[in-house]
Amino acid sequence: FVVETENQLMSQGGRYYILPVIYGKGGGLG
């Protein structure tokens, strides 16, 4: 659930706060 989850969360752009440490991005946080 790395790329698939990332794409899904990125699409929503609101629930990307659980994998910011794993990806080092935090799209939802920004």
From Swiss-Prot:
It comes from the Eukaryota. The keyword Ligase does not apply. InterPro entries: Kunitz_inhibitor_STI-like_sf. GO terms for molecular function: serine-type endopeptidase inhibitor activity. One of its GO terms (biological process) is negative regulation of blood coagulation. Keywords: Metalloenzyme inhibitor, Metalloprotease inhibitor, Protease inhibitor, Serine protease inhibitor. Belongs to the protease inhibitor I3 (leguminous Kunitz-type inhibitor) family. Potent inhibitor of serine proteases plasma kallikrein, plasmin and coagulation factor XIIa. Weak inhibitor of serine proteases trypsin and coagulation factor Xa. Does not inhibit the serine proteases chymotrypsin, elastase or thrombin. Inhibits kinin release from HMW-kininogen by kallikrein in vitro. This is Proteinase inhibitor CeKI.
